[in-house]
Amino acid sequence: MTWTLTFPEGMKYSTGEQVEPEDFIASVEYGLEVSPYADGYRAIESMEVDGRNVIVHLSEYQADMLYNFQSVFVGMIDKDEIEKMSADEKLWGCHPYGAYYLDEYQPGAYAILKANEGYKTNNPMLKNQGPSPIKTIKVVFSGESFTFAQGVKNGDYDVLSTVPSEYYDELKAAENIDIFEAYGAEVNYVELNMTDTLFQDINIRKAIIHAISRNNLAKYLSEFETPAHSLVLRKCLNYSEEAVDYYDTNYGYDAELSKKLLADAGWTDTNNDGFVDKDGKNFVFEFDCRDLETAKKVAQSLQIDLKAVGIDMQIKTQNWSYVNQDVVDGNFQMAYLGLGWSEPFLLVDNFCSRNVECTNPDPENYNAMVAKARKTVDYDERTEQITAIQKKLFDYCTIIPLVDINGYRCWRTEIQGIVHTPTGGFYLGDVVTDADGNFRNVK
């Protein structure tokens, strides 16, 4: 199996050197050697140059490879710089191919980007396939949300890459600001430890799941968050409503069913204290919560839902990295996790995988399903397989999708021609400017 890439003449780095097919080969080989993301293109066996083409030989089809190559963390560097520079020198001294290059950097404060005048793109979304008309960009790192929100309204800033949630309503109402959805797929979910004494019985895990009301959860969430009914979300490749329907049909809110499942397992309220008990002990467990606003709101909602069926959920809040480590170590009962990516294989590689023993009762067959889907060329067939993988995860009753995280970007309405996508794509190639390069209020 082969993949052919063409590198037309005229594409240049900011140094003025032309992009050569050999640069792609050198960049991939370097990435396979040092990159933590190398698994995203590990199927490449060999590469050869044929004129302006690179023929890539693959051991097998890898569905996530193309997505990985268009991501910002996979760049192309001049072969000479790869060979001559040390790793430290590359960090600040190399010149990856792109629309802009770094001209100045003040740590913790700002960076100045300058347009690469030798840049060419094949992006079909852009009419202008050449250098950006915006010649200089100042990217500001430090500042308070209030400063950014007022700054974009007053003209101190032209664009906010991320709208602060607490200023969303104010910026949306401002006549001089355009605001758009600009965030990839990110699902927040919990995993249950099926090796824990309380959760070894799948019907107990089902009782937990059926106790959760997403209508109640929605009351706690902001414009940036909506309840999730699947693990692969609407802005992710291979999303399917079938997965949503399956989850809602089989694992939707049903407090009475939750109570019945608990009672069938011997959990009833024998002392009328509002909590179910068994063998003299109340049903009490610990929720390992990330120290983030969304997670804390979810925890409050779940705590209320579970109390309604007689379960006492106690909340432990800590830094997200400690929550993740608790799951890896198996030191958890229910833990709040999150994954953000708009391509499904990174997701299905990680769901119920931080600690397989605690969360995945059938890893061999699960991994086989993922491997088969990754090799599937047809998109629709692959979507069916991703949906089947989600159903398998749901049926484990060790993972519960909870929140679909969203985000927004805004800019001043006087700037015309920005091309953007709901998943965060942001392109300046078609911005309207006058003869002097001004992009504000150009008619």
Describe each model-derived feature in a short phrase.
Residues 1-36, 50-55, 198-200:
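Aromatic- and charge-enriched surface segment that lines or borders ligand/interaction sites
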Residues 4-6, 39-82, 101-106:
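Surface-exposed binding/hinge segments that line
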Residues 16-18, 146-157, 173-174, 202-203, ...:
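Short helices/loops that flank or line small-molecule/ion binding pockets
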Residues 20-26, 51-55, 98-99, 131-136, ...:
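Alpha-helical secondary-structure segments
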Residues 71-136, 146, 254-256, 260, ...:
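Gly/Pro-rich hinge or "lid" segments in bacterial periplasmic/extracellular proteins
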Residues 106, 110, 211-244, 294-303, ...:
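Detector for C-terminal structural segments
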Residues 121-170, 312-314, 319:
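Ligand-site clamp/hinge motif
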Residues 268-341:
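Ligand/substrate-recognition segments at binding pockets and active sites
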